[in-house]
Amino acid sequence: MCIRDSRCNDGGFLLGVMGNHTASAGVIYFPCGMVDMSDVKGGSVDLHGNVWREIGEETGLGRADLTEEPGWHTVFIGPRIAHIKVMHARESAEVLRERILAFMAKDKEPELADIVIARKPADCSDRVAPFVMAFLHSAWSNS
């Protein structure tokens, strides 16, 4: 899942820096998560439900804050597959970042250590996950 700031049409994306206590410490991803057994229903994986559960757990944002872009984007990097759901926000990236940081501050051990705003490749460090960079390059070249 990725959050794109559509209010100012600046192409900004919000990325989460994984906390030091996580298996992916310091890696930068879209605020999202892995599928877990609670996402498996009737032998199928509920990716849509996973997106909303994870976004709420990691950022405190919900359906009142975000609008889904239709469809999914799929990125293949070697043996890995990432399914990405783009979400549009009415608030600016800066305002959303502050809201998410305030939400994270209430958690004793938040999964994310920080939120980064990416509007162009220069905003991305070498810690950004390869599938995220692949998606961002595609999104920026098509906007």
What are these regions (language model features)?
Residues 11-53:
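Conserved Nudix-box catalytic region and its N-terminal flanking loop in Nudix hydrolases
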Residues 1-3:
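Conserved small/polar residues in nucleotide/adenosyl-binding loops
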Residues 20-22, 27, 56, 60-104, ...:
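Active-site segment of metal-dependent pyrophosphate-handling enzymes
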